[in-house]
Amino acid sequence: MLQSLKNVFFSDTTTTTTPTTPTTPTTPTTTPTTTTTPTTTPTTTTTSTTPISNLSIKRDIGNINDYKNANYFNYYRILENKYNYLRYNTGLKNISNNETFKLIDFTIDSEMNNTCITSNWNQKYSNNSSTPVEGVYKIPLAPYSVVSGFTVEYQDKVFIGKIKSKEKAQNQYSDSIASGGQAFLAEKTQDGQFSFRIGNLPPNENVTIHLTIISEVCPHLSSLQNCFHRFLFPNYSFNFQFNLNIKLTLPIKTIELLYYPNKDIKFKENSNNKEATLTFSSNNGIDDDIVCIVEPENDIERPQSIIEHSKLNNTYAVSVNFTPSFSHLTSDDVNQKSEFIFLIDCSGSMSGEPIKKAKRALEIIIRSLNENCKFNIYCFGSRFTKAFDNSKMYNDETLKEISGYVEKIDADLGGTELLPPIRDILSTESDFEYPRQLFILTDGEVSERDSLINYVATESNNTRIFTYGIGNSVDTELVIGLSKACKGYYEMIKDNSNFEEQVMKLVSIAFEPTLSNIKVDWGTELQIEQGPTKIRPLYSGETLIVYALLKDNKIPQSTVQVSLIGDGPTGSKLEFPITLDFSKTIDYENNSVHTLAAFNIIKDLEEVERKGNHSNNRDRIEELGKNYGLISKYTSYIVTAASEQVTEETMKTLNIIQIPTTTTTSHTNFETEEDSDDLFSSENRNQTLANISNDMEKIKDIFDDISRLISEQSCMLNEIGDANIEASTLGINSIPQKSNIFSKITSFFSSPSEVSTSKSNFDSDIGSEERRNNNNNNNNNNININNNNNNNNNNNNNNNNNNNNNNNNNNNNNNNNNSDNSDSLLKLIRLQKANGSWSSPFSEFKIDLSKKPSNIDNDDIWITLIVINKILNDYPTQQSQYDLVIQKASKWVKQQLTRLNIPNQYGSLLATSKLYI
């Protein structure tokens, strides 16, 4: 039976006021912003709330203006970290300093609804070339965005792009150029950029480019956002105009435009504050990101829907979005299923205190889980081991078994090969009834980091990743990148004294209420094609967006009831009704809902092929691509036209700097099994200048780093000398770490084949077994050398660990009391059963069972109450470590009291039992 929604979801406690003038919210000083709020009669809703737990770790989820921490911004974060010069080479621009193409005017007209943002770009470039030109145009395109149309204008002619199969487009382009005609070929490149070539442009002819870009709206917390990153614009002055038309199905609370105060926001009359416009202009170009933040009123019980009618072919598409609120459920209400997998770095560098801390944290974590969970533990180094072949249900038997596995964990697995265990985990079909949450704990760096991050991103629909970076030498981008790619969280652990607290912080987030195993029941009246087919679990603060194309143009004359169904955080099935009223369809000019529905369906079809299911979806992918103007694995944009005057002079290729690519598909960040066609071979013909520019930048970076290092303490030289030489995947790093200087020098002076990303290497688990063994031997040699040096310098010590212990003797003495206290806490936690109780016989300390109240028929209830008090009383400073353990124990006690028909006596019994600790 479906649980009543009103018993599960409650309105947020809010107070809405009516400002007579725009208000300015409190924001970081680095993000100037103003807010416009509609002037309507306010409503005030106050609902009593019960927090998840008065003991739980409260995380700072930020505010809606903190867009750089939003999931959607991860694509741009990666660009900022790796392609520091990308902004200088966006659009039509020569590689040299003489700007043959210069942007003069740029206008963006956008329309936002609940799920889609359609943006029409108009860019006018001046062309000062004195010879015929083959130009190359590139812009970074986020994975949730698609180009659905483009045209090029020059010499009073308009050339419209059309989608064709990739092979036909390439052949047609080559034939047209060879015959002296004009041609344009557009692709999405492997590094995630939209790129097209403009062949045989006559000298001194200005060019106007029109693009239609359709993006999924960017949800962040309670807001809908539209972001144009500064890398989309050149770094010089030009005329810019931005117009945004907002049409939502819910009233708008506030509208903000970050960084640019000189904008105009107006709410449309008689729209119930559901429609508004925002305009902004500049004569000096764009210096910062353009971020529009719209906060609508949230309906936590009803998903919102849009029905779009396409006049072009008389078809219909539907989009559904939903942001439920779980904030007022108590910890006692939550009874959700989940799969927890812990992946622990057991390489040699984790020896000593780090591995001890990791094991202790693991022991606390596994006793924080509940009997609705599956769990498993992996240890990795040069090889990997795991507690179970596959995740097992959590109970006393499996808890005992995995505790024995944890006890034997040590830093004895050599190097750091993270890909093989991750592949083993992600290659296992996920169970959407048990949302998979993966915790990775590491202190090092891995080979081909970016390929690894791109790989896990393909599994973000079924796995959420949490990462911990330990120490000062960990690869920060690895830690952040893995978590962001799968919409999780990360924690950098620099100080071992807070190790367990920081670990439990992320575990607590993983326990927050979730809607999982989500499906849309479209009923029997509608024949639909849904995208995405499998819906990701909906975690706290996230928004669900799903699309569908109606297969049959025949639609019902009346409304249709469909449902969003999922497993709720209380353990019950939840159903959210959706009313589709086909008398209230919307005719968007650019068919944005149709386009994103097709885009998501294509991604699903390409993903099936990527996973090697031997499905041939080419015909359907080509059909969708051609119908909705979408670039895909099998389709490209092409425009050709016969030139009135055949270009006889030598054509010059104007090319932006070649950015080293990561392995990606057309829609995802992972290369398919088939190699992409090399549609840009003409760019290689004049690459010499690009290489020189790149090389000079690299040389400058290297010597800047060396100069900086020389000025630091001499001990840094030892760190550099011991550093492993690592070939950079991208060839260009962000801010280099001190220990990677030799790596950069080696990468620079190596042959391209030695430093470039190799798909074949990655497909064979990042190198052959022989190479991994060699790496392992090198790691072992390094460890032995370090130990020998330590022994020579410290003759009184028997081994490297003793040396470390002696060097830190004073610190250990200062922390002895805390360590003993922690060990005694861990002893108590180890005695807890899988259901949360402590049971008889209990030998850790004396418990007088004769004091047990007469209305309690189970000794375990009394023992558990006393142990709860014991932990709370004796270990107040370690509350964040045992919080979930206590929650589980108290929940078990309350369940037993409910069975005894005394559910309201928990507080009094807890107070009574405190007298006997």
Curated annotation (Swiss-Prot):
Q: Does the keyword Coiled coil apply?
A: yes
- GO:BP terms for this protein? vesicle-mediated transport
Query: Domain VWFA, which positions?
Result: 339-507
Give residue spans, biased composition: Low complexity: 13-51, 751-760, 774-818
Could you list the residue ranges forming a coiled coil in this record? none
Q: Which residues form the t-SNARE coiled-coil homology domain?
A: 679-741
The chain positions of domain VIT read 87-215
The protein's matches in Gene3D superfamilies, at most eight in alphabetical order, are given as: 1.20.5.110, von Willebrand factor, type A domain
Entry keyword Zinc: no
- Keyword vocabulary terms for this entry: Coiled coil
- Tree of life domain: Eukaryota
Q: Where is this region: Disordered?
A: 12-51, 751-822
Q: Which InterPro entries match?
A: SNARE, T_SNARE_dom, VIT, VWF_A, vWFA_dom_sf
Q: Check the record and name the SMART domains matching this protein.
A: VIT (SM00609), VWA (SM00327)
Protein name as it appears in the record:
von Willebrand factor A domain-containing protein DDB_G0285975
